[in-house]
Amino acid sequence: YACHPTKNKEESSMRSSVDAAAFYKAMTALMDIPAKSPVKVLQEIKVEFTSDHCTLSATDFGTWLSVTIPASGDDFAFVFWNSAGIQKVCRYFTGQLELELSGQRKSQIITMRCGDKGGKFPVYETEECPTWPEFEAKQSYTANAANILKCVKQVKYAVDLRSTRPEYQGVLFQNKHIWAVEGHRAACCDDGGLSVEKPFTVAVPALEHLKVFGNTDIQIDVNERCVTFRNEWIRLTAHCVPNATPLIYENIVPQKWNEEFCFHRKDFVQALKYLLACVGKTDKPYVRFDNGALTLSLIHI
């Protein structure tokens, strides 16, 4: 057992149990959320047992993520102290995991037992943990999380986090388009399975947490300030990029072309890498498309 010294006095305790593998999976999904912050509780994971379920959650004040798993036992809540360390410990638990909260106010201890393994760890009280933002949906949609995440990965290269224009700092959802633009280039994906009534913009780091949903259908709720992605067990809430002037896709991306041609993306990237290997790092090459040939010229040649 890994132990933390406590005072020897009679203490009331509350206990509940969960599946160890599900608890570890939930903690792992949340580990990317806690931020390096002078506010200690923002670096940790909150655990709340209510009725027949256990909800683990974390926030950095810009993004909130919670994962709910089945549980049985008493109702209680706490915030881990050193969540990263606890997550590593939970990796070795299998079967039924029992958690027991004991101790006096401001000096509570969580005891974790699983077979012949276990430990005692200090915890924070939940009153120090920020609450989720109040949310009233103005728009609601249903889509596949994996499809949306795939689109985000395809277009995020056109996001400019250093731009002073908010609309360039995130991924825009407009009609069927999931797209991004940063002044010099735009990227668009129409395979997200959405048809958005009122455009909204979300930062890439928040959208990358969609991976926790896997290949499942989710509900998307949107209002002026936030967007929530959720299913029965997982909820992800993020602030929309504030003060973003809605960009109109049709005004940014040309709708008519003088010429169109198709190519295999993998072959094109391979050919482009070959050409770029022939130039120096300080050169600024231009790629020329001419009658099926791909050539590269330097500005000073």
Language-model segments: what does each one mean?
Residues 2-298:
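Structural preference for solvent-exposed beta-strand-turn elements
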